[in-house]
UniProtKB/Swiss-Prot annotation:
Record function comment: Catalyzes the transfer of pyrophosphate from adenosine triphosphate (ATP) to 6-hydroxymethyl-7,8-dihydropterin, an enzymatic step in folate biosynthesis pathway.
Keyword line: ATP-binding, Folate biosynthesis, Kinase, Nucleotide-binding, Transferase
Pathway note: Cofactor biosynthesis; tetrahydrofolate biosynthesis; 2-amino-4-hydroxy-6-hydroxymethyl-7,8-dihydropteridine diphosphate from 7,8-dihydroneopterin triphosphate: step 4/4
Catalysed reactions, semicolon-separated: 6-hydroxymethyl-7,8-dihydropterin + ATP = (7,8-dihydropterin-6-yl)methyl diphosphate + AMP + H(+)
The keyword Kinase appears for this protein: yes
Any one Gene Ontology molecular-function term assigned to this protein's record: 2-amino-4-hydroxy-6-hydroxymethyldihydropteridine diphosphokinase activity
Name assigned to this protein: 2-amino-4-hydroxy-6-hydroxymethyldihydropteridine pyrophosphokinase
Gene this chain is encoded by: folK
Pfam families: HPPK
């Protein structure tokens, strides 16, 4: 089994419902088990700032799927929940990013792991580190909390405390 960390985000319509449905669908993936989910945080939009605030969270899973197959599954979940890829950093019903896939490193057109922007985004690192405070970034094994310490966290607020139902 491979431990996988995901970031989930949404800023359209019933944001909390999209996160919940994404978690439920992730928990039902073949050869995959949802291990933990973070609290939900509300954050200002990143990249393209003239849009609604996001809800963001992280989750931890273990899977026997390959990284490529796992990516296909997450993209299918996004599509089933109405995700339309029309604008970079635009509004979305759900965004599921693979942050870490075990200790593996991928740099292909389709898949970049560790996620290339995760160390620049407090809205990713805060929920991720809630799940695993001592997490390190492969391949350099620098603590992710050290990246977070250098980031502005002022626009991130707790929306809903951690839940364990899955």
């Amino acid at each position: 089994m491979t431990i996988v960390y995901l970031s989930l985000g949404t800023n359209m319509r019933d944001r909390a419902a999209y996160l919940q449905k994404a978690l439920e669908t992730l928990a039902d993936l073949p050869q995959t088990r949802l291990l933990a989910q973070s609290s939900i945080y509300e954050t200002a939009a990143w990249g393209k700032t003239d849009q609604a605030d996001f809800l963001n969270m992280a989750c931890q899973l273990d899977t026997q799927l390959t990284a490529a197959d796992f990516l296909k599954e997450t993209q299918a979940i996004e599509q089933s929940l109405g995700r339309v890829r029309h604008e970079k950093w635009g509004s979305r019903t759900i965004d599921i990013d693979i942050l870490l896939f075990g200790e593996e490193v991928y740099d292909t057109k389709e898949l970049k792991v560790p996620h290339p922007y995760m160390t620049e985004r407090a809205f990713v690192l805060i929920p991720l580190l809630e799940l695993q405070p001592d997490l390190k970034l492969p391949p350099n094994h620098k603590f992710l909390r050290d990246y977070l310490a250098a980031l502005d966290q002022s626009d991130i607020t707790l929306f809903s405390a951690q839940q364990t139902e899955f």
